[in-house]
Amino acid sequence: MSKVSEDARKKYLETIQDYKKTIEDIENREKLILQVMEKDATGSEYKKLRLAEENLNLLSYYVLMNNLSVSLLGVKNEGYLNEARKLCYKVVIYMEQVVSNVIDGPWSDYEDKVALISSFDYQDRWKLITKMGLAIQLVLTGYGDNTKWKWAFVELEARYATVVKNLLNLKTLFQDMDPNAEGYDIKTAHLTLARRLLEQSANKYREKFELSTLRFDDFRLAIKYLGALRYLALAVNKATEAENIKKKMDIWQQKLDNDLKRKDIAEKQ
């Protein structure tokens, strides 16, 4: 790699100064919101939605500073990428606190939590989840294909998928799929995204099990994400699709059971 010129380094440091000030301002706003929540928990769900948005904005500046490092200095800034990655988790955690982290449980398991943000409409939900997805993708792209965090992102993306799914109102989802219903296009896009992400999470957890960890908990999570996908199929009255997913779950469960038996036999020998 060619030596970075002093002019390029100076330009980089000057450019990111404004971004660092903005980062400080966002962090101070978050502290103020958290202080308010400590004194009064009223409307805490909406405040956490605000905190998720603030941290997505914060994350974007770390991504931007890394991109500037690449373009001006010719090198990735792992420190900024790591901060962005941590913020991805922070945003997901805020959202899990709002709509729960229930993967394959029934709507009744988290219905009460989602009801608390009823005025957070379908348009705002769509904007937030697409912004979250873009943020995760930008961080992944920043690290590159050969990152040591490859398998860690399987969990992050799966937790994001759960949040996307849990922001759907499964009680009204079938009616929402009527082309004449208000917000049909956005709600359909939301459902399509949730289904794609859940299937992707199932496949990636199985891949993680087979190619990396050999941890049975990863295989169990793969099956749970298929279960979540099945719940969505049932919610929109797609019985045949739900049955096909159930068959796939049974096949995967049988493989898991067989692997567990083989492991048990091997340990006893």
Give short role names for the model-derived ranges.
Residues K31-E38, V92-I93, S100, K165, ...:
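Amphipathic alpha-helical segments of tetratricopeptide repeats
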Residues K76, E83, E155, L221, ...:
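Alpha-helical positions within canonical tetratricopeptide repeat
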Residues N203-K247:
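Extended alpha-helical scaffolding segments
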Residues L13, E45-L72, K86-T147, W151-E210:
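Amphipathic alpha-helical repeat scaffolds of TPR domains
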Residues E30, L81, C88, M95, ...:
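Inward-facing hydrophobic residues that define packing positions of alpha-helical scaffold repeats
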Residues I117-Q123, Y143, D250-Q269:
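Alpha-helical linker/edge segments of TPR/alpha-solenoid repeat scaffolds
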Residues M1-A41, I265-K268:
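Eukaryotic intrinsically disordered, low-complexity segments enriched for acidic and Ser/Thr/Pro residues
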Residues Y19-I26, A52-L58, A194-S201, D218-Y225:
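Short amphipathic alpha-helical heptad-repeat segments
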